[in-house]
């Protein structure tokens, strides 16, 4: 396993199911020790935000402000030690039943995310400049498969 992969910020998003309008699936990454299961897009974003905060990657440009610390709700699958994360082979072998794509969040500015989505079906890479744009891109793609 190369060090370049271990520090790879890509998240493999596997969309498995569309159930009563909600998208369900799993996330795999060398930055996780176990799959992250999500029940809809907002659940995915909130859980990933917690992991980004824990790992401080990508670094938020402003400190998070909170009045309540929820220690019990923190994700326990985020790998602080890159050697403890999932292997490249395991991550690359994962595919969703409906759709699969790799998402890279490069920065977290203006209380949002910036990065791109790489579709594994050969579609053109799509950049995003905020979480709402990302949600629209993902939703549009998955709905087009129905």
Where are these regions (language model features)?
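Short aromatic-glycine-(Arg/Gly/Cys) micro-motifs in beta-strand/loop hairpins
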Residues: 16-32, 106-122
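Intrinsic disorder/low-complexity detector
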Residues: 1-13, 19-21, 46-111, 141-146
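Mixed-charge, glycine-accented linear interaction segment located at domain edges/termini
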Residues: 32-36, 45-53, 114-146
């Amino acid at each position: 396993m190369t060090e370049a992969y271990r520090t790879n910020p890509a998240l493999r998003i596997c969309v498995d199911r569309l159930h009563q309008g909600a998208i369900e699936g799993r996330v795999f990454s060398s930055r996780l020790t176990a799959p992250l299961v999500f029940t809809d897009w907002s659940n995915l974003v909130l859980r990933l935000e917690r992991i980004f905060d824990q790992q401080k990657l990508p670094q938020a440009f402003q400190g998070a402000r909170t009045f309540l610390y929820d220690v019990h709700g923190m994700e326990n699958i985020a790998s602080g030690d890159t050697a403890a994360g999932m292997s490249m082979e395991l991550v690359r072998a994962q595919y969703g039943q409906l759709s699969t794509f790799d998402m890279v969040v490069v920065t977290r500015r203006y209380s949002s995310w910036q990065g791109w989505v790489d579709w594994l079906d050969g579609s053109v890479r799509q950049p995003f400049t905020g979480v709402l744009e990302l949600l629209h891109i993902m939703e549009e793609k998955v709905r087009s498969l129905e």
